[in-house]
Amino acid sequence: MASRGVNKVILVGNLGQDPEVRYMPSGGAVANFTLATSESWRDKQTGEMKEQTEWHRVVLFGKLAEVAGEYLRKGSQVYIEGQLRTRKWTDQSGQDKYTTEVVVNVGGTMQMLGGRQGGGAPAGGGQQQGGWGQPQQPQGGNQFSGGAQSRPQQQAPAAPSNEPPMDFDDDIPF
């Protein structure tokens, strides 16, 4: 098993531009965008804050691509789970070029994070705030998995709704 290796990429970042959605001859959607991830630290020598931003090319396929095209915009924060792929292509002058991308296929995940952008409908499909018994994932929620197209997602049994957590009578002061 160890000889096969693992190719899994997890990113949380912000879109650098609106997704570009195209359709293959087979009818399947493909979305491309760049994702910025940043880290910041304090320079030990000068004490000033430093920041480094990395840009990642992301490619989504199928239903995920359609969802990205409809709901994601420049600046949207998103969680991506996919695989690293390098593809070879030829430019107009005949030179071979290589591009490394994070590919989100059937087994991958894309989850929208943060609040809604602009004045459109909420990405979470009208999630409610607070209240006991609310589902952890909003109804029609904002998590999309590439596998959702080919296999139904298992639902956990429903917990008793509209009841606050049980109040335990114990002597612990916190």
Curated annotation (Swiss-Prot):
The molecular function GO annotations come to: single-stranded DNA binding
Q: Which residues form the signal peptide?
A: none
Q: Where is this motif: Important for interaction with partner proteins?
A: 169-174
Q: Which domain of life is it from?
A: Bacteria
Q: What ranges does the record list as Low complexity composition bias? A: 134-160
User: What GO cellular component entries does it have?
Assistant: nucleoid
User: Where the record puts its DNA-binding region(s)?
Assistant: 55-61
The reply to whether Lyase figures as a keyword in the UniProt entry is no
Pfam families assigned: SSB (PF00436)
Q: Name one GO biological process term.
A: DNA repair
> Which parts of the sequence belong to the SSB domain?
6-111
Composition bias, Gly residues: 115-133
Q: Where is this region: Disordered?
A: 110-174
Q: What PROSITE patterns does its record include?
A: SSB
Annotated InterPro entries: NA-bd_OB-fold, Primosome_PriB/ssb, ssDNA-bd
For the keyword Transferase, the answer is no
Q: Which UniProt keywords apply?
A: DNA damage, DNA recombination, DNA repair, DNA replication, DNA-binding
Q: How does it assemble?
A: Homotetramer. Binds PriA via its C-terminus.
Task: Please give the function described in this protein's UniProt entry.
Answer: Plays an important role in DNA replication, recombination and repair. Binds to ssDNA and to an array of partner proteins to recruit them to their sites of action during DNA metabolism. Stimulates the ATPase activity of PriA. One tetramer binds to 26 nucleotides (nt) of ssDNA, a 55 nt piece of ssDNA probably binds 2 tetramers.
Identification of the protein by name? Single-stranded DNA-binding protein 1
What organism is recorded for this protein? Klebsiella pneumoniae subsp. pneumoniae (strain ATCC 700721 / MGH 78578)
Query: What high-level taxonomic lineage is stated for the organism?
Result: Bacteria, Pseudomonadati, Pseudomonadota, Gammaproteobacteria, Enterobacterales
Q: Which gene specifies this protein's sequence?
A: ssb1
